[in-house]
């Protein structure tokens, strides 16, 4: 009888150890919808919906490792950017504080929360909104813009920030969710 209990205990322990590796630790594979493009960088990848165009190094801002833009009527209505090493941070919380500091003056920050990103031990999401300035080919002055920043540390402990800005009504919530689900940190 003791041998049976020992075997049962060993089997249960083995199962428990195997299951410990399962679950949502952020290490699962990212989900990329069919037909979407992907911004690939050395620290993080993120996909974008049809209708966006990836910018070359010459077109995007010098601090952006990658960017994709959606235009309507000759104006940018949505931009997705990836920044790497934008700050020295030892945690996702520190990276989020630095990312928040980079949001446009006068923006309404609605807070930050934990978010699961494939490959990340921890990550933060910051939601905010602001009125467009009308500059740099963006939405007309005063247009409400919704923004989200996803931030954390990649596998080499380099801070990353993925920023999605979209004029209100130009990026469906379902597509924003798919963008977030597509993120893969490496």
Model regions: which residues?
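Bacterial signal peptide processing site
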Residues: 23-26
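Signature of long, low-cysteine stretches enriched in small and polar/charged residues
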Residues: 97-151
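Extracytoplasmic/secreted envelope proteins and their assembly/folding machinery
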Residues: 95-96, 100, 146, 173-180
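Surface-exposed amphipathic alpha-helical segments
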Residues: 52, 158-186
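Short, hydrophobic/aromatic-rich segments at coil-to-beta transitions
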Residues: 32-38, 63-66, 120-129
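C-terminal motif of bacterial Sec signal peptides marking the signal peptidase cleavage site
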Residues: 18-21
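Secretory pathway targeting signatures of secreted, lumenal, and periplasmic proteins
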Residues: 42-97
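Bacterial N-terminal signal peptides that target proteins for export
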Residues: 1-12
């Amino acid at each position: 009888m003791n041998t049976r209990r020992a075997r049962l205990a060993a089997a249960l322990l083995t199962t428990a150890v195997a299951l410990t590796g399962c679950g949502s630790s952020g290490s699962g594979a990212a989900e990329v919808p069919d037909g979407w493009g992907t911004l690939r960088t050395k620290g993080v990848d993120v996909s974008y919906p049809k209708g966006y165009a990836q910018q070359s190094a010459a077109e995007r801002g010098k601090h952006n490792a990658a960017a994709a833009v959606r235009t309507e009527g000759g104006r940018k209505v949505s931009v997705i950017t990836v920044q790497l090493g934008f700050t020295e941070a030892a945690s996702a919380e520190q990276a989020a504080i630095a990312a928040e500091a980079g949001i446009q003056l006068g923006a309404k920050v609605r807070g930050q929360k934990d978010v699961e990103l494939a490959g990340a031990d921890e990550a933060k999401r910051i939601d905010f909104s602001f009125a467009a300035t009308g500059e740099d080919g963006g939405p007309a002055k005063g247009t409400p813009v919704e923004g989200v920043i996803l931030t954390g540390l990649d596998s080499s402990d380099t801070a990353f920030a993925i920023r999605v800005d979209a004029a209100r009504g130009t990026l469906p919530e379902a597509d924003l969710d798919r963008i977030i689900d597509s993120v893969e940190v490496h």
